[in-house]
A protein has these predicted regions:
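Well-ordered alpha-helical scaffold segments within catalytic/enzyme domains
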Residues: 22-30, 47, 51-58
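An aromatic- and glycine-enriched ligand-binding surface/loop that stacks and positions planar moieties
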Residues: 13, 38-42, 50-224
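Active-site-proximal loop/short-helix segments
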Residues: 1, 47, 67
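Active-site-adjacent "gating/activation" loops or surface patches in catalytic cores
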Residues: 220-235
Length: 235
């Protein structure tokens, strides 16, 4: 009914997870052709894990506010809370993780193979790799289908750049965080040293070599607003 009162947030999110459960029950494990390009049981699990994680953390950190006046609630004889949602996220994630593994290849021979460039390569593969991929989109540039993306042009023409705040979230290679003092006195190139290796495979750093190129590319302010040029998805 159009005049029905709004359902409580917790009830709605409980139903979202129930829908994911129904999808998991009814969807196939894999499709006969192009399995990574169709919604499957794995996709349902991934969506449930993300939705439950978001709601669980939201309720945990907003409990007692106007958004979540009460953390623990009962709907249809089921008690929900931040803990309940987080456990649902764990259960869905564990079931999915057991079916997948991290991509570790370097089939494109991206420069920097010795330092493991698999993270950078994973996001520019011509064909989705089933090792880690849950759900992918098939692109085709022929004259009939023309399913394309233009993210490389967006990066170049609009100079999309990572913010300093975003960059500062990358931890050291040993898993520890930088102090405010360390970050304040660190040069641009020094900020990549001893850092989570995914940083240099997401943002252009020292020794960056474009795919298909042989020599390192110098940082150009024509492609970035602040020096932190994003290279993820660029092939």
């Amino acid at each position: 009914s159009l005049n029905k009162p709004r359902d409580p947030r917790g009830y709605v999110m409980m139903k979202v997870l129930e829908d994911c459960d129904k999808a998991y029950e009814r969807l196939p494990e894999a499709w006969g052709s192009g399995p990574l390009f169709h919604v499957s049981k794995n996709a349902a699990l991934a969506l449930k894990a993300r939705a439950a994680l978001f709601e669980g953390t939201f309720r945990k950190y907003h409990a007692g506010s106007e958004f979540v006046p009460q953390d623990e609630q009962v709907f249809e004889d089921k008690t929900i809370s931040s803990t309940w949602f987080l456990q649902e996220a764990v259960n869905a994630a564990e079931k999915l993780i057991g079916k997948k593994a991290l991509y570790t290849g370097n089939t494109m021979g991206i420069a920097g193979k010795a330092t493991n460039a698999s993270y950078r390569e994973y996001f520019v593969l011509e064909v989705a790799d089933p090792t880690e991929t849950i759900l992918a989109r098939a692109y085709n540039s022929d004259d009939i289908v023309q399913v394309r993306h233009g993210i490389q042009f967006d990066y170049k023409n609009h100079k999309h750049s990572a913010t300093t705040r975003f960059v500062n979230h990358y931890l050291k290679s040993d898993g520890k965080a930088y102090t405010e003092t360390e970050l304040a006195t660190m040069s641009y190139y020094d900020s990549f040293k001893g850092r989570d290796p995914r940083m240099a495979q997401t943002i252009q750093g020292p020794g960056y070599i474009g795919i298909g190129d042989k020599a390192p590319e110098q940082l150009s302010m024509e492609r970035t607003l602040n020096g932190y040029r994003v290279i993820k998805y660029i092939s």
